[in-house]
Amino acid sequence: MGGLKLPPQTLHGIHGGRRPLTAPSSKPSFTIQPNYSSSISTGFTTRNVALFSPSIFPCGYFILGGARERRFGARNTQASVQPVTEELVEDKTKENPVSGDAIRRRFLEFYASRSHKVLPSASLVPDDPTVLLTIAGMLQFKPIFLGKAPRQVPRATTAQKCIRTNDVENVGRTTRHHTFFEMLGNFSFGDYFKKEAIKWAWELSTKEFGLPADRLWVSVYEDDDEAFEIWHDEVGVPVERIKRMGEEDNFWTSGATGPCGPCSELYYDFHPERGYKNTDLGDDSRFIEFYNLVFMQYNKMDDGSLEPLKQKNIDTGLGLERLARILQKVPNNYETDLIYPIIEKAAELANISYALADDRTKMNLKIIGDHLRAIVYLISDGVLPSNIGRGYVVRRLIRRAVRTGRLLGVKGGGEDGVFLPAIAEKVIELSPHIDPDVKARGHSILDELQREELRFVQTLERGEKLLDQMLAEALLNAQKSETLPCLSGKDVFLLYDTFGFPVEITTEVAEEQGVKIDMDGFEVEMENQRRQSQAAHNVVKLAVENGGDLAENVHDTEFLGYDTLSARAVVESLLLNGKSVIQVSEGSEVEVLLNKTPFYAESGGQIGDHGFLYVTQDQSKQTAVVEIKDVQKSLGSVFVHKGTIREGVLEVGREVEAAVDAKLRQRAKVHHTATHLLQSALKKVIGQETSQAGSLVAFDRLRFDFNFHRPLHDSELEEIENLINGWIGDGTLLQTKVMSLTDAKEAGAIAMFGEKYGEQVRVVEVPGVSMELCGGTHVSNTSEIRAFKIISEQGIASGIRRIEAVAGEAFIEYINARDSQMKLLCSTLKVKAEEVTTRVDNLLEELRTVRNEVSALRAKAAVYKASMIASKAFSVGTSKTIRVLVESMDDFDADALKSAAEYLMDTLQDPAAIILGSCPDEGKVSLVAAFTPGVVDIGIQAGKFIGPIAKLCGGGGGGRPNFAQAGGRKPENLTNALEKARTDLILILTEKAN
């Protein structure tokens, strides 16, 4: 799907990028009903009104009037289609009828009673390589909308978890922007269309949820007369409250070509008293869009013309947080019961009253509440903090939450001051109706947050040191150029983006030292980042240029590879440089799509098969050969065979013989089954709580990442190897079954943390040893693995360890390579294999002796150099009794400088102050400060004095009052640094001596 528009301000990403407006300061009024109970049920606990709108009622309680309670009473509607899970729509007779949970449940019940299948939310990690994260409810149905996959049901309804970070800077500033939100949706796949979608949306809004009809406005595409007439003639919306809007706002497209159509949006009017004149639906102070209906009815052609689709679809999205805001009558989404308990927890940890806080403090609390929701659900879906891809999204959100909390003074209960886990506990507490798996994964989520926050605090401390260096350089440069000192926008952005430094803190620290901030330059860097983020989140498209045409002709690939390594298949499509072609000739790199294949496509950690495609004529003459070097999945289950035409010509429609390289497949099978055995062994040796965090199943090795807090001991690694080799020797037959996900979990099958599974799953079992959900290829008997060897164990991230190992043929190759290396080592050292360790130890001892001798010679040379420069010492103070020496010592290292300084202290005698600097290696600076007792006694310390000098050289350091060492990475600044040291010593010593 090429180039889907996803402007940040819309529920469904389909109307134009309107400029966000500041939330109104006025607050809606409430009617206090004295004859009713003074509390409301939220579905979790009975809470004070501050849960819903603390900014309105810092004290007291709020309840709904009787009439409104009756209007929002639970319906006894029977769904005609059974839901997937009871948790999605189970009746909650005691819940507040307008709680977030009740709204979600009632939405799903409403459409279930209209023959929609209630489907669970998809993972935040989409099954689509062209999209970073799940950003809309329609994403899990994208292959169906594109005609790439058959529909399983004609109608569906979901409550989809979504993540959007392309507008993260607006979070907390506006009333409605979020990184995590829920999109309630109803979908039709060639079943009902515009009339039903519009009427049901209106019925849901006005009858099910009781929204006043006179407060609802509608937007339609300017040329969509059909939608206009349905809204006006059949629903009864006055013409004055129906706005025709242009293509940018109300026409959804999937790219240059492909499925598209007009859309219609429902808006709630907070201020109907303003009338109809000059009304702008983009005015956030008055309106909020809460429901969006997309009518997919056209196919956009290459020439821009629109042709009617054979199958017309409905794709809708209703923002749960937005509707909750309306129904709960609070001034913004954050003060609904979906988010406010999290904000309340953050305020408690900061010892702040949200109700009495200023706007800036409230904004920061909203940021924390919003980001913690996104962080918890992302980690639950298997997205762990890292520096790339989805992991970087999580890491940035965590860092933004931490630095925002530090601004507010939020502190956890422990000695380390970590606070995110405490707030995340509240998110987990609220999670059962959003994602029931979150609570089960709570311990792992909290552990990951704890580790990441601690790591970031250390990063912040490094950032503080870097800021000090930047300010020192800015002051030095200003002194040279005789200009005002200024910190560049790039430096400020580096501190903000990499080290998590809020601009406010950078500005405050800089101003204390008389340094200004280049805010214009910083905004340029921020805008560049926004554009990159927007580009990353606006991509919901096929990976090929003419994806619309491809979608019409190619369907899911039938995988035959569990049962055979060769099969006859038909070429359905050829891609050359991303473009669909009819024919490809010899020498070309090509992507081949077949109707069926024995080739395994990369997934579940296992790499794709290698092999060949053969085209023959008359069952004998070979006319084309394609070497396949990789197989990937696209659009769900379309297998893309990537390779090179070695001979002949390949054409669309041609029948081919697809043959997998059997030897390489066997290597992959061996390593995949060995990976399952490794996970079982790890759980036995280090504990059942460890879990898989990633894997690679390759032809030459396997890699297994797992959650654990420390390196494994040699004895543990040996025990793991022995267990696995024992299971291999047992010669156990593997069992493979297909069953429901529920049955698999009840049977004890291990599911990959964060992996997305369908209703039916494949279970691979080594009886008595291992049972996992897995779609990969495996050996039939553990004896096929032959042998297993761990070749490395290391940490790759905080709390994540990695084991690399070999098995089968790769094990034999590894042992042979080790044997060859040992023979070469024995030959070089001229010893037997059993004598290598002793010989190496002897050589290392000899090396240490030689190094000590060299160091002693350098120290002597440094002392000699010191004796030559001692005469350059000069006296300061009124009595001229304090001797000062500041000199460069060429290329002596830190140890040699220390020897020289000690010699000079004895030679110059007390009182004396000595500063020495050198450049021992390219790109390095060494500094030493040595002060005799007489200098220390008058109030100057070497450890404190050397720090600012080292910063001028791009480094730092410190030490005792009488002796300190430092280093740096900017040798070109050494002369200026020593000059500053000389000047400062003269000023300080003269002042203190007098």
UniProtKB/Swiss-Prot annotation:
Localisation per UniProt entry: Plastid, Chloroplast; Mitochondrion
Residues annotated for Zn(2+) binding in this entry: 672, 676, 774, 778
E.C. numbers: 6.1.1.7
GO biological process: alanyl-tRNA aminoacylation
Assigned GO CC terms: chloroplast; cytosol; mitochondrion
Keyword Nuclease: no
GO terms assigned for molecular function: alanine-tRNA ligase activity; aminoacyl-tRNA deacylase activity; ATP binding; tRNA binding; zinc ion binding
The name this protein goes by in its record: Alanine--tRNA ligase, chloroplastic/mitochondrial
Lineage: Eukaryota, Viridiplantae, Streptophyta, Embryophyta, Tracheophyta
